[in-house]
């Protein structure tokens, strides 16, 4: 599904070193038992399973994108699941499958919730959100501005190595999101 939107490795199978390393990421799969097919999934790694390189940096699929503070590594990572490579198969995406597509995504999120039940030490999910080049830039900028305004990481727990540059003017974004709370701005 992500390949159709411009993602993936470009190889015949989207497997990388994080799938094959000594302590690999796990897969959360949504399965349709009647049709015997996969509807969607997430790749994930428990923070308690994270290994560290010789410099003490966490070996994560997002390590090339983010700097992780010592506070994040010590206080949050042990209670975190890193998520990545989420997908809903094309046949179950809402534009093609109607309500079945919504249920596939809902079931995927239910699976994430189930992980927190079987692993009660987990309090946080972390991961990157991919917005492909085809994604409308103004829409992307609106999302990024909204998140930065209302959910800014004051402690700088996780910071981007190369911050995204907004193309939409700050004036326009401030005019769109001019309320005091995220609920009012939403």
Predicted regions located by residue number:
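Acyl-donor binding region in acyl/amide transferases
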Residues: 49-186
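Short amphipathic alpha-helix that is part of the acyltransferase structural core
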Residues: 1-46
């Amino acid at each position: 599904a992500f390949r159709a939107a411009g993602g993936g490795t470009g190889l015949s199978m989207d497997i990388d070193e994080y799938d094959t390393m000594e302590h690999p990421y796990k897969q959360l799969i949504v399965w349709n038992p009647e049709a015997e097919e996969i509807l969607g999934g997430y790749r994930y790694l428990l923070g308690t399973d994270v290994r560290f390189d010789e410099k003490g940096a966490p070996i994560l699929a997002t390590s090339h994108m983010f700097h992780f503070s010592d506070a994040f590594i010590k206080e949050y990572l042990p209670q975190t699941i890193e998520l990545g490579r989420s997908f809903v198969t094309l046949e179950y995406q809402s534009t093609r499958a109607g309500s079945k597509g919504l249920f596939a995504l809902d079931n995927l999120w239910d699976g994430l919730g189930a992980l927190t039940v079987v692993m009660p030490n987990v309090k946080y999910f972390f991961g990157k959100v991919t917005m492909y080049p085809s994604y409308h830039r103004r829409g992307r900028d609106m999302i990024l501005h909204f998140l930065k305004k209302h959910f800014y990481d004051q402690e700088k727990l996780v910071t981007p190595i190369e911050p995204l540059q907004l193309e939409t003017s700050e004036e326009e974004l401030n005019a769109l999101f001019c309320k005091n709370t995220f609920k009012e701005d939403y």
